[in-house]
Amino acid sequence: FDDAEATTPVPALVASRLEDERVIFFDKTRSDSTVHRRGRLDSVSVKLLDERARVIGFGRFVGVLTNRAMRMRPSALGILAARRARVVEALGTEPGSHTHKLALEAYDCLPLEFLLPAQLEDVRRVVASVVSAAELSQIEVVSVADPENRSFFVSVVLPRRAYEERFRGEIDRLLESRHAASQIDHRTSFLDEDLALVHFFCACESDLAPGALEGLEVEVRDLVE
């Protein structure tokens, strides 16, 4: 930053991160991977600090998460373990209770691609939906937009007995045809053998318009009910 012209405008994304308390940021870039697997390249940005703890720039690493990393429990990463504690605290569950333990497991079922860039409140909403689906044996759908990165995340949780493999393909087609998803990564996992979780990470070619995901949760629910 010291070498930048005083009149050079600061990009909106950089400005927002300067005010953000986080030090590490994870994004999906707008460039496609040409190795390892199909999809958007991953980007990790780290704030660079001077001896007085002032931000003087960002370091950036671009690549793709390895299959091993994608299979890791999120709480095995220090930065995400700390966030898990904050998310569960925000839910207000009683430590040691069934709901508290369920919330911890629900967090660890979420994909790294969502947890690393997501805001705390968005993670809390998704974890709360998993807990609700488990305790009430019902279908829960939550969508989270990330306009800065032209992407969005969809969490679909339903009783395992109601889960069918065809749902993923049908939801993929819906996301592509009605919500302009150009690339879709999905993960399927099961919680306590009673709950199926299907998560979709979607990248778009153009900017997400305000209200772009309006109606999406109802549309997805209609497909799986």
Task: For each feature predicted by the language model, list its residue ranges.
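Non-catalytic interaction/regulatory segments
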Residues: F1-E225
